[in-house]
Swiss-Prot record:
<dbReference type="InterPro" id="IPR001705">
    <property type="entry name" value="Ribosomal_bL33"/>
</dbReference>
<dbReference type="GO" id="GO:0022625">
    <property type="term" value="C:cytosolic large ribosomal subunit"/>
</dbReference>
<protein>
    <recommendedName>
        <fullName>Large ribosomal subunit protein bL33</fullName>
    </recommendedName>
</protein>
<comment type="similarity">
    <text>Belongs to the bacterial ribosomal protein bL33 family.</text>
</comment>
<dbReference type="InterPro" id="IPR018264">
    <property type="entry name" value="Ribosomal_bL33_CS"/>
</dbReference>
<dbReference type="GO" id="GO:0003735">
    <property type="term" value="F:structural constituent of ribosome"/>
</dbReference>
<keyword id="KW-0689">Ribosomal protein</keyword>
<keyword id="KW-0687">Ribonucleoprotein</keyword>
<dbReference type="GO" id="GO:0006412">
    <property type="term" value="P:translation"/>
</dbReference>
<dbReference type="Pfam" id="PF00471">
    <property type="entry name" value="Ribosomal_L33"/>
</dbReference>
<dbReference type="InterPro" id="IPR011332">
    <property type="entry name" value="Ribosomal_zn-bd"/>
</dbReference>
<dbReference type="InterPro" id="IPR038584">
    <property type="entry name" value="Ribosomal_bL33_sf"/>
</dbReference>
Length: 55
């Protein structure tokens, strides 16, 4: 079997609420850390989410 190209990552809110999303990314095409602007329901606004490892 071949090695999987997608890995699971955790997108953690930069608003320091502790809220996070779990998503997948292709590790071969996206080598840098992922950042996305998504909705944080605890902060009640759109904030930037940064990639961290799932523990």
């Amino acid at each position: 079997m071949a090695k999987a190209t997608t890995i699971k990552i955790k997108l953690l809110s930069t608003a320091d609420t502790g809220f996070f999303y779990v998503t997948k990314k292709n590790s071969r095409t996206m080598t840098e850390k992922m950042t996305k602007t998504k909705y944080d329901p605890i902060a009640r606004k759109h904030v930037e989410f940064k990639e961290t490892k799932i523990k």
